[in-house]
Regions:
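Glycine-rich phosphate/pyrophosphate-handling loop used in enzymes and phosphotransfer proteins
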Residues: 1-228
Length: 228
């Protein structure tokens, strides 16, 4: 049965050749050049405003092609596994955070929780969340290249009735997340939080995570930043 399944998969690949989800290059699900973006890009950070406060927000890329197309495929393709790419994006950001000195300045945290942005109940039900892979990569890099112990804690949830952000304006995105997240576990004293999202556009999701974990918040991080 396994042989037949593998043979059928190979036959589909021959009959319907794939193209790179990032740039469209023929006969590659993800071409080497696009795959290399996860480690080749240099993460940057800026201060993100959140009401009367602000915090560091790390980003790996602008939300433009080919990164945009890769992220869209990761979120919506049921046939393509991009978890390794997402993990390496997290590693890249985590290395930059660890090497920046940010963790030894302005925070008393001796350990970190890396908290992925909450997926909708539908994505959680079908295992379609992608930020968890980025969080795992970031935690591995920070924990391996700093004196701070680091682990992934999936402890942020959306209220179940909250709708998708797709098709909403910036203001609608902010309003749809405001007040609709909660932590499933209290963050212990001496533990800092880094929040992870795939894309930050209006900042609604990341700022709501900041509200939930404000007392413990160290920084936010994302694969891509949309400035439209």
């Amino acid at each position: 049965m396994g042989f037949l399944h593998e043979a059928a998969h190979e036959l589909v690949g021959v009959c319907i050749p794939s193209s790179c989800v990032g740039c469209g290059r023929w006969d590659h699900s993800v071409c080497p050049q696009c795959a290399a973006l996860s480690s080749a890009l240099l993460p940057q950070w800026e201060l993100q405003e959140a009401g009367n406060a602000e915090y560091p927000l790390w980003e790996l890329s602008d939300y433009s092609d080919p990164m945009r197309s890769i992220i869209v495929a990761a979120k919506h393709s049921s046939r393509l596994d991009l978890s390794e790419f997402l993990f390496e994006c997290g590693v890249n950001i985590g290395l930059s955070i660890a090497q920046s000195g940010m963790l030894s300045v302005g925070t008393d945290a001796t350990s970190l929780w890396v908290v992925p942005a909450p997926a909708s109940w539908k994505r959680r039900l079908f295992g379609q969340g992608i930020t968890i892979h980025v969080a795992r990569g970031l935690a591995a890099a920070v924990g391996g290249h700093s004196e701070v112990t680091c682990c992934v804690r999936d402890v942020c949830r959306l209220d179940p009735w909250v709708s998708s952000q797709a098709g909403k304006s910036s203001e609608q995105r902010r309003q749809s997340r405001h007040g609709h997240m909660h932590a499933t576990q209290r963050v212990p004293q001496g533990v800092g939080v880094i929040g992870i999202d795939d894309v930050v556009a209006s900042g609604g999701t990341m700022n709501e995570m900041f509200r939930v974990f404000e007392r413990s918040w160290v920084a936010g991080a994302c694969i891509a930043r949309s400035r439209q």
